[in-house]
Amino acid sequence: MLDGNWRSVVDRSLIPIGRSLHRAGVTADAVTVVGIIMAAGASVVIGLGYLRLGFALLVLTGVPDALDGPVAKASGTASPRGAFFDSVSDRLTDALLLGGVAWYLAGTRPGHLVMLPVAVLVLSLLISYQRAKAESLDLNAKGGLMERAERFIVLAIGLLFSEALIVVLWLMLVLSAITAVQRFAKVWRQASLERDTPYQRRAARRRQLRVERRAERRQRLVARRRVERRPR
């Protein structure tokens, strides 16, 4: 929800900072790596029970996550490779943060509550996969109640007010499940209505090319056999 409505606005507002970092010699990949390192530190701190410090590190983790795109645009190095690295780092950051929460619960809350952040992580990965797969099919799966920005904000509230952490995790789980259903339904409708999508046209073109190549190979084979059969 916030990713779709505000991400482009935030990116544009951070372009001047991205230019300054580029002039200082900072690359977008370096910013992304810093974000991963900070997420790993936050994971350890949360796992050890320092939730307020974990909250601070979680907030700081959002800084490089917001800046890597503007730095890439300012330096003119925005590329599929960078987009891939950024997407992978986002999933890794999610796993580190929720893994830290699971570690904390394993040591302080006996029972099955440790599975709560694990379930949230599974749903967050499913939500991300839905978008990636939909985009590979030239469909749109953006949107939903609990996108990545919302997960960051709600988890930060849970770390800041530790007595409400379990309630916050349940809220994240429910909203993530709703988001997964929303995205599934959205893509399902598009796939049902759009009979001639760019993906389908490319797939048809690939099939046509395969048929043409097989026909060419057969023609070459027939021509070669005719040459071999000629009397010398």
Model-derived segments and spans:
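Membrane interfacial helix-start motif at the N-side
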Residues: 21-26, 82
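Ser/Thr-centric signal marking residues that sit
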Residues: 29-32, 179
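Helix-loop junctions at the membrane-solvent interface of multi-pass transporters
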Residues: 25, 42-49, 100, 161
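A feature for the membrane-embedded catalytic helix bundles of lipid/isoprenoid biosynthetic enzymes
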Residues: 2-18, 87-232
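Membrane-embedded alpha-helical segments that form the functional core of polytopic membrane enzymes
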Residues: 32-81, 113-122, 166-175
